[in-house]
Design a protein with these regions (language model features):
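N-terminal amphipathic/basic-hydrophobic helices that include classical n-h-c signal peptides
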Residues: 1-18
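Cytosolic catalytic domains that perform sulfur/thiol-centered chemistry
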Residues: 13-301
Length: 301
């Protein structure tokens, strides 16, 4: 393991303060801007231009926010013909990166993006996977903050390294072989977070093969939020997920999508609805189709 030098002059707040683990509103974040025990991440990203949103970040962001790039910071190296489009990084490398960004054991992390929260959810899930639970996604994200004319900044912060213990959550990540076995197991539910059209095998614009993993059920992550970008009521989300799970224990379900992004949004919505943690297939559809021997289905579930 590595060590990160503990800063001597950084004063941290009372660790007994409320811990936010799923969602947080703009008013609460505004009240904590500048607090040493709060770290903000801007996760805006464009799948068609990996650098576009970082340029937007430099043009203006929530004060104190650190930019986290999906491809560079939250994904590992792509292995052509083997991995998905956004594979998970090595956990120790990812842990080191977060520590260098100033995350300590009692630090509250807030994450936002410019869309429904899928990229922010990837960082949210990643931190929880490493064992840090004090992380929440900003309700409505960048659009909600701007719509209220709240403060903006062009200053790029210089975080002071800190350290939280690495406690990797065993069993949260599954591989393609596990998914293959699950596809024929009635006690396991595969949930696909992509749009319903891509699930059916229509309008596939990101991956060279269309369709879905046999046995999966479609639950588009966009259905977790309303037109205003706010998450649906927790009880409504709970009923929706119970319908898709259809008696399957939530711990036994596996979430996937195109490359392990919108699946994290579904996992966030499940947590918001009061469910325990499910499992993630991070390689998702883009990894599944790299092996022509793996079965493919099309049409509705």
């Amino acid at each position: 393991m590595f060590s990160v030098e503990q800063p001597r002059l950084l004063v941290h707040l009372d660790s007994t303060l409320t811990m936010h683990q799923t969602l947080i509103d703009c008013e609460t974040l505004l009240a904590h801007l500048g607090h040493s025990d709060w770290v903000i991440f801007d996760c805006r990203f464009d799948l068609s231009d990996a650098d576009a949103k970082e340029r937007d970040y430099r043009a203006g962001h929530i004060p104190g926010a650190i930019y986290a790039n999906l491809s560079r910071d939250l994904s590992g190296p792509v292995i052509p013909g083997k991995s998905g489009r956004n594979p998970l990084p090595d956990p120790e490398s990812l842990h080191r990166r977060f520590c260098n960004w100033g995350i300590g054991p009692k630090v509250q992390v807030v994450v936002y993006d410019s869309g429904p929260g899928s990229f922010a959810a990837r960082l949210w899930w990643s931190l929880r996977w490493l064992g840090h639970e004090r992380v929440a996604v900003l309700e409505g994200g960048w659009k909600a903050w701007n719509s209220q004319n709240l403060p903006l900044s062009t200053e790029v912060p210089k975080p002071v390294p800190w350290r939280f213990p690495l406690q990797l959550q065993e069993g949260w990540v599954v591989d393609a072989e596990t998914v293959l076995q699950a596809s024929t197991n009635p006690e396991v539910r595969l949930i696909d977070g992509r749009g319903a059209d891509r699930f059916r095998g229509e309008n596939e614009t990101l991956d060279p093969v269309a369709g879905h993993i046999p046995g999966a059920r479609s639950l588009p992550s966009l259905s977790n939020v309303g037109k205003d970008g706010q998450f649906q009521d927790a009880e409504e989300l709970r009923k929706k997920f119970e319908g898709v799970l259809a008696g399957c224990a939530v711990e036994q379900h596996i979430s996937y999508c195109g490359s392990g992004i919108t699946a994290c949004h579904n996992l966030l919505a499940m947590k918001h609805a009061g469910f325990a943690a499910g499992r993630l297939y991070p390689g998702s559809w883009s990894e599944w189709i790299t092996d022509p021997k793996r079965p493919i289905a099309t049409g509705a579930a």
